[in-house]
Amino acid sequence: MIDITLPLTDIHRHLDGNIRAQTILDLGRQFNIALPAQTLETLIPHVQVTSTEPDLVSFLTKLDWGVKVLASLDACRRVAFENIEDAARNGLHYVELRFSPGYMAMAHQLPIAGVVEAVIDGVRDGCNTFGVEARLIGIMSRTFGEAACLQELDALLAHRENITALDLAGDELGFPGSLFLSHFNRARDAGWHITVHAGEAAGPESIWQAIRELGAERIGHGVKAVEDRTLMDFLAQQRIGIESCLTSNIQTSTVASLADHPLKTFLEHGVLASLNTDDPAVQGVDIIHEYHVAAPAAGLSREQIRQAQINGLEIAFLSDGEKRALREKVAAA
């Protein structure tokens, strides 16, 4: 189902949600950190979703073991490098990796700006080694409150030239976007693109707020948009992209089943929706699974899957020239 003549992208992919189980085991042993299991086979149920979680917050706890072993900046650098290696193995030409530096720093009180620098270094080394193009999106983890998000923002702004966009993720219901208006004003002043997790746990009003008040150019997940016809029209007319993550939305119980997922409806409505993974290591999936298994199960035709692939580059945070160069590179391969 993947069109090999077109660039393959993943623009909603959490770096800190893609820490390999083997790496968790390795770093746990290196830093003498107590883990819930001592072999790869027995560790996987603790760090990977093996059945549907009751809600988003329950799903997010699966990510915690990955960041609990980040006891040094070198460990952060390693997982960033491995994220690019994983992208290359999946056949991705372009990836936007998003990460929450405060979340990664928290367990071992690492310097947040140091985490940002380590991630930048690891991703750069990975791109040079594996030939994948990547951009970084900084996340503010709303779950930890406004002050913690301000610390993350300051750390990201210290490396603003290496960050492409700002995102807001975490507990959407408990910490609405309205709490973070000043944060996003600073991000836009820095010249960053804006994408926001919205309409995943909360309703379409959360998406409207992200667009109108935070300046979102893309929406992460956005499944509740289908509940508001005016919003659907607005998304299509204003070319505001939707970063769809099929398997993730089932695992978080955001959507009941793949057959119920709104991605097909988005595409039929002319919304620029794309296919992405979200947290590959935690979910136990990759981009190939999303195209070959999840998308057909969600009712997408071959042409709709191809359109989602086209949309992935169309709404990527790249210049028109960069998009054209990537298309030409893939076509010539």
Swiss-Prot record:
Zn(2+) binds at residues 12, 14, 197, 278. It is an enzyme of class 3 (hydrolase). GO terms for biological process: adenosine catabolic process; hypoxanthine salvage; inosine biosynthetic process; nucleotide metabolic process; purine ribonucleoside monophosphate biosynthetic process. The active site is at 200 (proton donor). GO terms for molecular function: 2'-deoxyadenosine deaminase activity; adenosine deaminase activity; zinc ion binding. Keywords: Hydrolase, Metal-binding, Nucleotide metabolism, Zinc. Binds 1 zinc ion per subunit. InterPro entries: A/AMP_deam_AS, A_deaminase, A_deaminase_dom, Ado/ade_deaminase, Metal_Hydrolase. HAMAP family: A_deaminase. Belongs to the metallo-dependent hydrolases superfamily. Adenosine and AMP deaminases family. Adenosine deaminase subfamily. PANTHER family: ADENOSINE DEAMINASE. Catalyzes the hydrolytic deamination of adenosine and 2-deoxyadenosine. This is Adenosine deaminase. It comes from Salmonella dublin (strain CT_02021853).
